[in-house]
Amino acid sequence: MVSLPQDRIKQLEKRFEIIESQMTTNPNAETYVKLASEYAELQPVIASIRALNALYGEITELETIINDKQTDIEMRHLAQEELPSLHKKVEQLEKELQILLLPKDVADEKSAIVEIRAGTGGSEAALFSGDLFRMYERYAHAHHWKVEVISLSEGEVGGYKEIIATISGKGVFSKLKYESGVHRVQRIPETETGGRIHTSAATVAVLPEAEEIDIDIRPEDIRIDTMRASGAGGQHVNTTDSAVRITHIPTGIMVVQAEKSQHQNRARALQILRARLFDIERQKVESERSASRKSQVGSGDRSERIRTYNFPQGRVTDHRINLTLYKLDRILEGDLDEIIHALISDHQTALLMEMDNN
């Protein structure tokens, strides 16, 4: 049988009863929304606990029948035959409940800001950045998420030197957070006459989109500078100082937005800054929680080489979990679920091991 934290289970059951009671006492709209949200979060956990308790009860009844010498022998045989299937159901439900009880990432249900930057490899790296952005865009559309480009800098022969976009929807960050890191591509460039394979790289940063309630940016902690926006080759695209640079003084984080609307640039720069500051706080909590964890999955370390896309072999390898798939074309078309589910599973296994050790 799986070891379950009984004290925590009792606390959750008690909390669920309190929420149910408070929701029926006509709270104001704001309180009701908060209670309903917590209720929805706890409901699958409580349903799993109740289903398990029912199975425990059935097993106890069957064991009573089996051990009662006064009971008809045929009834005892039937009970003996039924017992293994119930134990199997219990084992499965206990594992599911264990996953439900794992520590939650506070940002999992949020939308995400995805930043892709070309690394080593010049024009090839920019083209690869474009491939990665289209991959995430298609993955997002398949999940009915909304994609909006915040800013971009195009490569000389296509793709992007840098592109930043928001991907909005429920639980976006819980899936895409595993994409942070260095992505490497191996392929023969179209301009390569000798048929040699070139290696290029791009860095992906996935940040949870933060609300004002999540992170408080004090006016005295930021410096806002305006400057002339420039187009390709440095020429001025308009006559007003529309570009905005926001510097967060305590951390030194700097965000620049250079589209045509100064108002929009300011709003988007603050949006990115808020996400970066929120991610710093989140990473602190995660690093404290996982100091003893060996798995790097979900660590968000952007200097870590996480995945290689090998075009000649049609192969994609995720180095964190040693997963290799020979369906590069489908993955670049947005078929990422197999990789992401494997990463989530590995992360959950690491958390379970951590719980067992504690």
Swiss-Prot record:
PTM notes: Methylated by PrmC. Methylation increases the termination efficiency of RF1.
InterPro entries assigned: PCRF, Pep_chain_release_fac_I, Pep_chain_release_fac_I_sf, Prokaryotic/Mito_RF, RF-1
Origin: domain of life? Bacteria
The question of whether Protein biosynthesis is a record keyword is answered with yes
Q: Where is this region: Disordered?
A: 284-309
User: What are the N5-methylglutamine sites (modified residues) in this protein?
Assistant: 235
Q: Which GO terms describe its cellular component?
A: cytoplasm
The family database entries (SMART domains) matched by this protein are listed as: PCRF
User: What is the similarity comment for this entry?
Assistant: Belongs to the prokaryotic/mitochondrial release factor family.
What does the protein in this record do?
Peptide chain release factor 1 directs the termination of translation in response to the peptide chain termination codons UAG and UAA.
NCBIfam families attached here? prfA, PRK00591.1
Q: Which HAMAP family does the entry mention?
A: Rel_fac_1
Name of the protein: Peptide chain release factor 1
Q: List the source organism.
A: Bartonella tribocorum (strain CIP 105476 / IBS 506)
